[in-house]
Regions:
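Catalytic cores of DNA base-excision repair glycosylases
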Residues: 1-202
Length: 202
């Protein structure tokens, strides 16, 4: 999987605050759209202090490439205000405090722990949830169940890398529909391929 997906990319954002905001912007959009919106936003408002005072219409214009820009603009401004008021302008480093921020769920909070603080955490999105179940690593119904199950099944030293690898693999190979099983290096050991997908691809 590492050979196909590639090694984890180095997060280019300079601050923990920028990692948090970019992760919120990444919800329900493509990576390239997130990158464009983040670059435009941080050029004008690189800190929580500046973003908390920015006009909402200006934020909306800058993050428009990320989609759902009106909702996201309200969220990231509200987050910035709370960070300034409660956390000295920086994201908190605990899961519980991150979850207290507007628009921050478990996946977003765990991504911030991983990429901003380099803490072991298990971000689970649709790709991680799908691939984990297809490979038989877990048998779960929800991303939260998958998170807990993977934390038990995967060695802690691999947690930081797992999200990146599975997301990239889910985008390239293990697609939601018509997965490219014959291109997958794991297909000979994959229960999904052996039990059902194989019949569709041979």
């Amino acid at each position: 999987m590492r050979k196909t997906a590639g090694m984890p990319a180095v997060v280019s954002h300079k601050t923990k605050f920028q990692v948090l905001i970019s992760t919120v912007l990444s919800q329900r959009t493509r990576d390239e759209n997130t990158a464009t919106a983040s670059k435009q936003l941080f050029k004008s408002f690189p800190s929580a202090e500046l973003l908390s005072k920015a006009p909402l219409c200006k934020i909306e214009k800058l993050i428009r490439p990320a989609g759902f820009y009106r909702v996201k603009a309200k969220r990231i401004k509200a987050i910035s205000i709370l960070l300034v008021e409660r956390f000295g302008g920086q994201p908190p480093s605990s899961l519980e405090q991150l979850l207290s921020l507007p628009g921050v769920g478990r996946k977003t909070a765990n991504c911030v722990l991983v990429y901003a603080f380099k803490k072991p955490a298990m971000p689970v999105d649709v790709h991680v949830h799908r691939i984990s179940n297809r490979l038989g690593l877990v048998e779960t119904k929800t991303p939260e169940q998958t998170e807990q199950a993977l934390m038990l099944a995967v060695p802690k030293e691999n947690w930081l890398e797992l999200n990146h690898l599975m997301v990239r693999y889910g985008q390239k190979i293990c697609l939601p529909r018509n997965p490219r099983c014959l291109e997958c290096k794991l297909h000979s050991k994959c229960p999904c391929f052996l039990n059902s997908c194989r019949k569709k691809q041979v």
